[in-house]
Protein backbone atom coordinates (compact mmCIF):
# COMPACT_ATOMS: atom_id res chain seq x y z
CA UNK A 1 0.00 0.00 0.00
CA UNK A 2 2.81 2.39 0.88
CA UNK A 3 4.66 1.63 -2.31
CA UNK A 4 1.72 2.58 -4.40
CA UNK A 5 1.79 6.24 -3.22
CA UNK A 6 3.60 8.65 -5.52
CA UNK A 7 6.09 10.91 -3.75
CA UNK A 8 5.49 13.73 -6.24
CA UNK A 9 1.83 13.91 -5.51
CA UNK A 10 2.59 14.01 -1.82
CA UNK A 11 4.88 16.93 -2.31
CA UNK A 12 2.26 18.81 -4.30
CA UNK A 13 -0.29 18.39 -1.54
CA UNK A 14 2.15 19.74 0.98
CA UNK A 15 2.84 22.84 -1.08
CA UNK A 16 -0.85 23.49 -1.45
CA UNK A 17 -1.40 23.23 2.24
CA UNK A 18 1.39 25.68 2.93
CA UNK A 19 0.05 28.21 0.46
CA UNK A 20 -3.38 28.02 2.04
CA UNK A 21 -1.90 28.66 5.45
CA UNK A 22 0.00 31.67 4.12
CA UNK A 23 -3.15 33.12 2.60
CA UNK A 24 -4.99 32.73 5.88
CA UNK A 25 -2.20 34.48 7.77
CA UNK A 26 -2.16 37.37 5.27
CA UNK A 27 -5.82 38.04 5.85
CA UNK A 28 -5.31 38.25 9.61
CA UNK A 29 -2.27 40.62 9.62
CA UNK A 30 0.11 42.37 7.20
CA UNK A 31 2.86 40.25 5.83
CA UNK A 32 6.17 41.38 4.47
CA UNK A 33 6.37 40.79 0.77
CA UNK A 34 9.25 38.75 -0.51
CA UNK A 35 12.10 40.59 -2.22
CA UNK A 36 11.05 39.31 -5.61
CA UNK A 37 7.70 41.21 -5.42
CA UNK A 38 9.35 44.66 -5.61
CA UNK A 39 9.32 46.01 -9.10
CA UNK A 40 11.22 49.27 -9.76
CA UNK A 41 8.94 50.01 -12.67
CA UNK A 42 5.95 50.47 -10.38
CA UNK A 43 5.17 53.75 -8.63
CA UNK A 44 2.95 54.31 -5.65
CA UNK A 45 0.24 56.96 -6.08
CA UNK A 46 0.01 57.71 -2.36
CA UNK A 47 3.63 58.38 -1.44
CA UNK A 48 5.14 58.71 -4.91
CA UNK A 49 7.89 56.13 -4.27
CA UNK A 50 8.97 53.49 -6.78
CA UNK A 51 9.01 49.71 -6.21
CA UNK A 52 5.45 49.25 -4.93
CA UNK A 53 1.90 50.23 -5.68
CA UNK A 54 -0.75 51.96 -3.62
CA UNK A 55 -2.23 48.56 -2.73
CA UNK A 56 1.06 47.28 -1.36
CA UNK A 57 1.62 46.95 2.36
CA UNK A 58 5.09 48.44 2.02
CA UNK A 59 3.61 51.87 1.37
CA UNK A 60 4.54 54.15 4.29
CA UNK A 61 1.19 55.91 4.01
CA UNK A 62 -0.50 52.71 5.24
CA UNK A 63 1.97 51.77 7.97
CA UNK A 64 2.79 55.10 9.69
CA UNK A 65 5.40 53.54 11.93
CA UNK A 66 7.68 52.98 9.03
CA UNK A 67 6.81 56.27 7.30
CA UNK A 68 9.75 58.45 6.42
CA UNK A 69 9.90 62.08 5.43
CA UNK A 70 10.52 62.20 1.69
CA UNK A 71 13.83 63.80 0.96
CA UNK A 72 14.11 66.67 -1.50
CA UNK A 73 15.56 65.91 -4.86
CA UNK A 74 17.81 68.97 -4.89
CA UNK A 75 18.48 72.32 -3.22
CA UNK A 76 16.66 75.38 -4.56
CA UNK A 77 19.16 78.10 -3.87
CA UNK A 78 17.71 80.41 -6.51
CA UNK A 79 14.25 80.58 -4.92
CA UNK A 80 15.06 80.53 -1.23
CA UNK A 81 17.06 83.29 0.50
CA UNK A 82 19.22 81.01 2.62
CA UNK A 83 21.87 83.73 3.12
CA UNK A 84 20.17 87.12 3.57
CA UNK A 85 22.19 90.25 2.80
CA UNK A 86 23.46 92.08 5.84
CA UNK A 87 23.00 95.91 5.97
CA UNK A 88 26.09 97.97 5.40
CA UNK A 89 27.69 99.93 8.20
CA UNK A 90 26.67 103.62 8.59
CA UNK A 91 30.29 104.68 8.72
CA UNK A 92 30.70 104.10 5.01
CA UNK A 93 27.34 104.88 3.43
CA UNK A 94 26.98 104.48 -0.27
CA UNK A 95 25.91 107.20 -2.70
CA UNK A 96 22.31 105.95 -2.75
CA UNK A 97 22.04 106.13 1.01
CA UNK A 98 23.25 109.73 1.01
CA UNK A 99 20.52 110.80 -1.43
CA UNK A 100 17.87 109.06 0.66
CA UNK A 101 19.08 110.77 3.81
CA UNK A 102 18.91 114.21 2.22
CA UNK A 103 15.36 113.61 1.00
CA UNK A 104 14.26 112.54 4.46
CA UNK A 105 15.79 115.62 6.10
CA UNK A 106 14.06 118.08 3.77
CA UNK A 107 10.45 117.14 4.69
CA UNK A 108 11.41 117.11 8.36
CA UNK A 109 12.57 120.72 8.06
CA UNK A 110 9.33 121.69 6.31
CA UNK A 111 7.13 120.15 9.02
CA UNK A 112 7.50 123.07 11.50
CA UNK A 113 6.58 125.57 8.80
CA UNK A 114 3.46 123.63 7.87
CA UNK A 115 2.43 123.33 11.50
CA UNK A 116 2.87 127.06 12.03
CA UNK A 117 0.62 127.85 9.06
CA UNK A 118 -2.00 125.39 10.29
CA UNK A 119 -1.99 127.00 13.73
CA UNK A 120 -2.46 130.44 12.20
CA UNK A 121 -5.51 129.41 10.15
CA UNK A 122 -7.09 126.97 12.60
CA UNK A 123 -6.42 129.01 15.74
CA UNK A 124 -5.03 126.07 17.68
CA UNK A 125 -2.15 126.70 20.13
CA UNK A 126 1.28 125.41 19.06
CA UNK A 127 2.27 122.05 20.41
CA UNK A 128 5.00 122.00 23.02
CA UNK A 129 8.19 120.13 22.06
CA UNK A 130 8.79 116.84 23.79
CA UNK A 131 11.68 116.57 26.30
CA UNK A 132 13.48 113.93 24.25
CA UNK A 133 13.96 116.47 21.44
CA UNK A 134 11.52 114.91 18.96
CA UNK A 135 8.98 117.30 17.54
CA UNK A 136 6.29 114.76 16.82
CA UNK A 137 5.63 111.18 17.69
CA UNK A 138 5.37 108.56 15.04
CA UNK A 139 1.98 107.16 14.20
CA UNK A 140 2.99 103.66 15.27
CA UNK A 141 4.43 104.58 18.67
CA UNK A 142 1.20 103.87 20.51
CA UNK A 143 1.08 100.41 18.94
CA UNK A 144 4.50 99.49 20.29
CA UNK A 145 3.44 100.17 23.89
CA UNK A 146 0.55 97.91 24.87
CA UNK A 147 -0.59 99.97 27.86
CA UNK A 148 -0.18 103.41 26.31
CA UNK A 149 -3.42 105.03 25.03
CA UNK A 150 -3.73 106.65 21.65
CA UNK A 151 -2.73 110.34 21.79
CA UNK A 152 -5.65 112.75 21.36
CA UNK A 153 -5.06 116.48 20.81
CA UNK A 154 -7.66 118.73 22.41
CA UNK A 155 -8.02 122.52 22.45
CA UNK A 156 -9.73 124.79 24.96
CA UNK A 157 -10.85 127.35 22.38
CA UNK A 158 -14.20 127.09 20.63
CA UNK A 159 -14.26 126.84 16.83
CA UNK A 160 -14.72 130.17 15.12
CA UNK A 161 -17.68 130.75 12.86
CA UNK A 162 -17.18 131.56 9.24
CA UNK A 163 -17.83 135.32 8.72
CA UNK A 164 -19.84 134.57 5.58
CA UNK A 165 -22.14 132.19 7.44
CA UNK A 166 -22.52 134.65 10.31
CA UNK A 167 -23.54 137.41 7.89
CA UNK A 168 -26.08 135.11 6.25
CA UNK A 169 -27.67 134.17 9.55
CA UNK A 170 -27.89 137.83 10.56
CA UNK A 171 -29.52 138.82 7.28
CA UNK A 172 -32.01 135.95 7.55
CA UNK A 173 -33.02 136.98 11.06
CA UNK A 174 -33.39 140.61 10.04
CA UNK A 175 -35.42 139.59 6.99
CA UNK A 176 -37.79 137.56 9.13
CA UNK A 177 -38.21 140.44 11.53
CA UNK A 178 -39.02 142.84 8.69
CA UNK A 179 -41.61 140.44 7.26
CA UNK A 180 -43.27 140.08 10.65
CA UNK A 181 -43.20 143.84 11.12
CA UNK A 182 -44.79 144.37 7.70
CA UNK A 183 -47.53 141.87 8.47
CA UNK A 184 -48.30 143.16 11.95
CA UNK A 185 -49.71 146.59 10.87
CA UNK A 186 -52.24 144.90 8.62
CA UNK A 187 -53.40 142.71 11.44
CA UNK A 188 -53.55 145.64 13.85
CA UNK A 189 -55.60 147.78 11.46
CA UNK A 190 -58.00 144.95 10.71
CA UNK A 191 -58.36 144.16 14.40
CA UNK A 192 -58.96 147.80 15.26
CA UNK A 193 -61.58 148.13 12.52
CA UNK A 194 -63.37 145.00 13.69
CA UNK A 195 -63.24 146.04 17.35
CA UNK A 196 -64.44 149.60 16.63
CA UNK A 197 -67.67 148.31 15.17
CA UNK A 198 -70.50 147.70 17.57
CA UNK A 199 -72.57 144.52 17.78
CA UNK A 200 -75.22 146.09 15.56
CA UNK A 201 -72.74 147.54 13.10
CA UNK A 202 -71.07 144.19 12.69
CA UNK A 203 -74.35 142.67 11.60
CA UNK A 204 -74.76 145.21 8.80
CA UNK A 205 -72.37 145.38 5.86
CA UNK A 206 -71.51 148.07 3.33
CA UNK A 207 -72.51 147.67 -0.30
CA UNK A 208 -70.65 149.04 -3.33
CA UNK A 209 -71.22 148.99 -7.08
CA UNK A 210 -69.37 145.76 -7.73
CA UNK A 211 -67.77 144.11 -4.66
CA UNK A 212 -65.05 141.61 -5.39
CA UNK A 213 -65.22 138.23 -3.64
CA UNK A 214 -63.73 138.66 -0.20
CA UNK A 215 -61.00 136.29 0.86
CA UNK A 216 -61.81 134.58 4.14
CA UNK A 217 -59.12 133.08 6.34
CA UNK A 218 -59.61 130.24 8.75
CA UNK A 219 -59.43 130.91 12.43
CA UNK A 220 -60.37 134.00 14.46
CA UNK A 221 -58.23 136.36 12.34
CA UNK A 222 -60.09 139.32 10.75
CA UNK A 223 -61.00 139.27 7.09
CA UNK A 224 -59.22 141.09 4.31
CA UNK A 225 -60.69 144.35 3.10
CA UNK A 226 -61.29 144.56 -0.65
CA UNK A 227 -62.35 147.87 -2.19
CA UNK A 228 -64.47 147.43 -5.31
CA UNK A 229 -64.37 149.45 -8.54
CA UNK A 230 -67.25 151.38 -10.02
CA UNK A 231 -67.94 149.30 -13.09
CA UNK A 232 -70.94 147.51 -14.42
CA UNK A 233 -71.05 143.95 -13.08
CA UNK A 234 -70.46 141.33 -15.73
CA UNK A 235 -72.34 138.11 -15.38
CA UNK A 236 -74.89 139.31 -12.85
CA UNK A 237 -74.35 139.88 -9.15
CA UNK A 238 -70.87 139.23 -7.88
CA UNK A 239 -72.03 137.64 -4.62
CA UNK A 240 -75.27 135.96 -3.70
CA UNK A 241 -75.71 134.56 -0.17
CA UNK A 242 -76.23 130.83 -0.42
CA UNK A 243 -77.93 129.08 2.49
CA UNK A 244 -79.42 125.67 3.30
CA UNK A 245 -82.74 124.60 4.80
CA UNK A 246 -81.54 124.88 8.38
CA UNK A 247 -81.46 127.72 10.90
CA UNK A 248 -77.67 127.45 11.14
CA UNK A 249 -77.48 128.59 7.49
CA UNK A 250 -79.37 131.88 8.08
CA UNK A 251 -77.56 135.11 7.22
CA UNK A 252 -77.58 138.44 9.00
CA UNK A 253 -79.06 141.52 7.42
CA UNK A 254 -76.74 143.68 5.35
CA UNK A 255 -77.83 147.29 4.96
CA UNK A 256 -76.17 149.81 2.63
CA UNK A 257 -74.63 152.86 4.26
CA UNK A 258 -75.71 156.05 2.59
CA UNK A 259 -72.90 158.23 3.94
CA UNK A 260 -70.20 155.98 2.39
CA UNK A 261 -69.90 156.46 -1.34
CA UNK A 262 -67.27 153.81 -1.93
CA UNK A 263 -67.18 151.66 1.22
CA UNK A 264 -65.03 148.56 1.36
CA UNK A 265 -66.65 145.19 1.80
CA UNK A 266 -65.40 144.06 5.18
CA UNK A 267 -66.73 140.69 6.30
CA UNK A 268 -66.27 140.56 10.05
CA UNK A 269 -66.01 137.57 12.40
CA UNK A 270 -69.17 135.97 13.67
CA UNK A 271 -71.18 138.10 16.20
CA UNK A 272 -73.31 136.80 19.09
CA UNK A 273 -76.24 134.57 18.22
CA UNK A 274 -78.92 137.01 17.09
CA UNK A 275 -80.14 135.45 13.88
CA UNK A 276 -83.17 133.76 15.38
CA UNK A 277 -85.06 137.07 15.43
CA UNK A 278 -87.82 137.63 12.90
CA UNK A 279 -85.88 140.27 10.97
CA UNK A 280 -83.85 137.59 9.21
CA UNK A 281 -82.86 137.52 5.58
CA UNK A 282 -82.01 140.02 2.90
CA UNK A 283 -83.81 140.81 -0.29
CA UNK A 284 -82.36 140.78 -3.78
CA UNK A 285 -83.97 141.52 -7.10
CA UNK A 286 -83.07 140.38 -10.59
CA UNK A 287 -84.29 141.75 -13.88
CA UNK A 288 -85.68 139.23 -16.39
CA UNK A 289 -84.69 138.93 -19.99
CA UNK A 290 -80.91 138.56 -19.50
CA UNK A 291 -78.55 136.03 -20.97
CA UNK A 292 -77.21 133.17 -18.92
CA UNK A 293 -73.44 132.69 -18.72
CA UNK A 294 -71.86 129.36 -19.50
CA UNK A 295 -70.68 128.73 -15.99
CA UNK A 296 -71.08 130.59 -12.72
CA UNK A 297 -67.86 131.33 -10.80
CA UNK A 298 -67.74 129.76 -7.40
CA UNK A 299 -66.25 131.34 -4.33
CA UNK A 300 -63.93 129.40 -2.06
CA UNK A 301 -65.53 127.63 0.86
CA UNK A 302 -64.20 128.10 4.37
CA UNK A 303 -64.97 124.83 6.15
CA UNK A 304 -65.62 121.26 5.14
CA UNK A 305 -69.22 120.06 4.74
CA UNK A 306 -71.06 118.71 7.77
CA UNK A 307 -74.33 116.95 8.44
CA UNK A 308 -77.57 118.98 8.29
CA UNK A 309 -79.73 119.74 11.32
CA UNK A 310 -83.39 120.51 11.81
CA UNK A 311 -84.51 124.09 12.39
CA UNK A 312 -86.77 125.20 15.25
CA UNK A 313 -88.90 127.49 13.05
CA UNK A 314 -92.41 126.50 12.01
CA UNK A 315 -94.32 128.43 9.36
CA UNK A 316 -98.12 128.82 9.60
CA UNK A 317 -100.14 127.96 6.52
CA UNK A 318 -102.30 131.08 6.91
CA UNK A 319 -99.30 133.41 6.63
CA UNK A 320 -98.78 132.69 2.93
CA UNK A 321 -100.37 135.35 0.72
CA UNK A 322 -100.09 134.39 -2.92
CA UNK A 323 -96.91 133.49 -4.76
CA UNK A 324 -95.33 130.14 -5.41
CA UNK A 325 -92.78 128.18 -3.44
CA UNK A 326 -90.11 125.80 -4.65
CA UNK A 327 -87.01 127.88 -5.44
CA UNK A 328 -84.03 126.99 -3.30
CA UNK A 329 -83.11 130.59 -2.51
CA UNK A 330 -84.80 133.82 -3.53
CA UNK A 331 -84.14 137.44 -2.74
CA UNK A 332 -86.30 140.55 -2.33
CA UNK A 333 -85.46 144.17 -3.23
CA UNK A 334 -86.13 147.14 -0.92
CA UNK A 335 -88.91 149.66 -1.76
CA UNK A 336 -86.42 151.98 -3.48
CA UNK A 337 -84.85 149.22 -5.57
CA UNK A 338 -86.10 150.51 -8.91
CA UNK A 339 -84.95 154.05 -8.25
CA UNK A 340 -81.35 153.40 -7.35
CA UNK A 341 -80.57 151.36 -10.44
CA UNK A 342 -77.95 148.61 -10.55
CA UNK A 343 -76.01 148.20 -7.36
CA UNK A 344 -74.15 145.58 -5.44
CA UNK A 345 -75.24 142.38 -3.81
CA UNK A 346 -75.33 142.01 -0.01
CA UNK A 347 -72.24 141.40 2.00
CA UNK A 348 -71.22 137.96 3.11
CA UNK A 349 -73.25 137.08 6.20
CA UNK A 350 -71.87 136.28 9.60
CA UNK A 351 -72.35 133.07 11.45
CA UNK A 352 -73.55 132.27 14.95
CA UNK A 353 -72.07 129.56 17.24
CA UNK A 354 -74.52 127.12 15.65
CA UNK A 355 -73.98 128.41 12.14
CA UNK A 356 -71.42 127.87 9.43
CA UNK A 357 -70.40 130.37 6.72
CA UNK A 358 -72.17 129.56 3.49
CA UNK A 359 -70.65 129.26 0.03
CA UNK A 360 -71.20 132.36 -2.10
CA UNK A 361 -71.94 131.72 -5.74
CA UNK A 362 -72.80 133.96 -8.65
CA UNK A 363 -76.25 133.52 -10.20
CA UNK A 364 -76.32 132.14 -13.75
CA UNK A 365 -77.87 135.40 -15.09
CA UNK A 366 -75.93 138.34 -16.41
CA UNK A 367 -78.20 140.94 -14.81
CA UNK A 368 -77.39 144.05 -12.79
CA UNK A 369 -77.81 143.72 -9.04
CA UNK A 370 -79.85 146.12 -6.92
CA UNK A 371 -78.97 147.29 -3.39
CA UNK A 372 -80.34 144.98 -0.77
CA UNK A 373 -81.53 145.53 2.75
CA UNK A 374 -81.49 142.14 4.47
CA UNK A 375 -80.46 138.59 3.61
CA UNK A 376 -83.22 136.05 3.18
CA UNK A 377 -83.00 132.27 3.05
CA UNK A 378 -85.42 129.44 2.48
CA UNK A 379 -85.17 125.71 2.06
CA UNK A 380 -86.19 123.22 -0.61
CA UNK A 381 -89.62 121.79 -0.35
CA UNK A 382 -87.99 118.40 -0.93
CA UNK A 383 -85.65 119.02 1.99
CA UNK A 384 -88.59 119.89 4.20
CA UNK A 385 -90.25 116.60 3.41
CA UNK A 386 -87.04 114.76 4.11
CA UNK A 387 -86.30 116.45 7.44
CA UNK A 388 -89.86 116.13 8.69
CA UNK A 389 -89.95 119.68 10.16
CA UNK A 390 -91.70 122.66 8.59
CA UNK A 391 -88.99 124.88 7.04
CA UNK A 392 -88.89 128.60 6.38
CA UNK A 393 -90.88 129.86 3.43
CA UNK A 394 -90.40 132.73 1.05
CA UNK A 395 -93.13 134.63 -0.75
CA UNK A 396 -92.29 135.56 -4.36
CA UNK A 397 -93.99 138.43 -6.19
CA UNK A 398 -93.51 139.96 -9.61
CA UNK A 399 -93.37 143.76 -9.55
CA UNK A 400 -94.70 146.18 -12.13
CA UNK A 401 -91.29 146.77 -13.68
CA UNK A 402 -90.86 143.07 -14.41
CA UNK A 403 -88.60 142.29 -11.45
CA UNK A 404 -89.02 139.65 -8.82
CA UNK A 405 -89.38 140.31 -5.11
CA UNK A 406 -89.18 137.81 -2.30
CA UNK A 407 -90.17 138.09 1.35
CA UNK A 408 -89.49 135.77 4.24
CA UNK A 409 -92.48 134.22 6.01
CA UNK A 410 -91.31 132.61 9.22
CA UNK A 411 -92.64 132.27 12.74
CA UNK A 412 -90.57 133.36 15.77
CA UNK A 413 -88.40 130.75 17.44
CA UNK A 414 -90.08 128.63 20.12
CA UNK A 415 -93.51 130.19 19.40
CA UNK A 416 -96.67 128.49 18.27
CA UNK A 417 -97.37 128.64 14.53
CA UNK A 418 -100.94 129.80 15.18
CA UNK A 419 -99.89 133.43 15.76
CA UNK A 420 -99.10 134.94 12.39
CA UNK A 421 -99.91 138.42 13.66
CA UNK A 422 -96.84 138.52 15.90
CA UNK A 423 -94.63 137.55 12.99
CA UNK A 424 -96.08 140.25 10.76
CA UNK A 425 -95.65 142.81 13.52
CA UNK A 426 -91.99 142.01 14.04
CA UNK A 427 -91.12 141.92 10.34
CA UNK A 428 -92.46 145.17 8.87
CA UNK A 429 -90.76 144.70 5.53
CA UNK A 430 -92.96 141.68 4.81
CA UNK A 431 -96.15 143.66 5.40
CA UNK A 432 -94.89 146.44 3.18
CA UNK A 433 -94.20 144.03 0.39
CA UNK A 434 -97.61 142.42 0.69
CA UNK A 435 -99.28 145.70 -0.21
CA UNK A 436 -97.46 145.88 -3.56
CA UNK A 437 -99.25 144.48 -6.58
CA UNK A 438 -98.21 140.91 -7.30
CA UNK A 439 -98.89 138.35 -9.97
CA UNK A 440 -98.96 134.62 -9.34
CA UNK A 441 -96.34 132.88 -11.46
CA UNK A 442 -95.71 129.16 -11.92
CA UNK A 443 -92.60 127.69 -10.27
CA UNK A 444 -90.93 127.01 -13.61
CA UNK A 445 -90.47 130.74 -14.21
CA UNK A 446 -88.90 131.12 -10.80
CA UNK A 447 -86.47 128.31 -11.50
CA UNK A 448 -85.49 129.89 -14.79
CA UNK A 449 -85.00 133.36 -13.30
CA UNK A 450 -83.26 132.19 -10.14
CA UNK A 451 -81.10 129.12 -10.59
CA UNK A 452 -78.86 128.07 -7.78
CA UNK A 453 -76.80 124.91 -7.84
CA UNK A 454 -77.94 122.23 -5.43
CA UNK A 455 -74.35 121.21 -4.76
CA UNK A 456 -73.77 124.45 -2.85
CA UNK A 457 -76.64 123.66 -0.52
CA UNK A 458 -75.34 120.15 0.09
CA UNK A 459 -71.89 121.47 0.93
CA UNK A 460 -73.38 124.12 3.21
CA UNK A 461 -75.57 121.56 4.96
CA UNK A 462 -72.58 119.31 5.59
CA UNK A 463 -70.59 122.19 7.09
CA UNK A 464 -72.39 121.77 10.38
Swiss-Prot record:
Residues 1-43, 70-389, 415-437 are annotated as: Disordered. It holds the Pfam family zf-CCHC_6. InterPro entries: FAM90, Znf-CCHC_6. Residues 74-89, 97-114 have a biased composition (Basic and acidic residues). Residues 182-197 have a biased composition (Low complexity). Belongs to the FAM90 family. This is Protein FAM90A22. It comes from Homo sapiens (Human).
Amino acid sequence: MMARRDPKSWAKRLVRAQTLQKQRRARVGPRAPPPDEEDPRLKCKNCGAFGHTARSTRCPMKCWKAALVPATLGKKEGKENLKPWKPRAEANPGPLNKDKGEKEERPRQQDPQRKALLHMFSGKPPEKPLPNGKGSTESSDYLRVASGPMPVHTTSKRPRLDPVLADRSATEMSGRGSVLASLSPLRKTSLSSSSSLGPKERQTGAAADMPQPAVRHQGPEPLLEVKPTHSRPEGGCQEVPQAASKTHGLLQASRPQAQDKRPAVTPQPCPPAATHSLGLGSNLSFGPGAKKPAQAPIQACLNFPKKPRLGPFQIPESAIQGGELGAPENLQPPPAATELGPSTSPQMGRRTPAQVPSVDRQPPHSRPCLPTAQACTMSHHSAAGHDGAQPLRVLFRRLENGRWSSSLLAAPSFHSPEKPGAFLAQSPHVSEKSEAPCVRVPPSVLYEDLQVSSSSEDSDSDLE
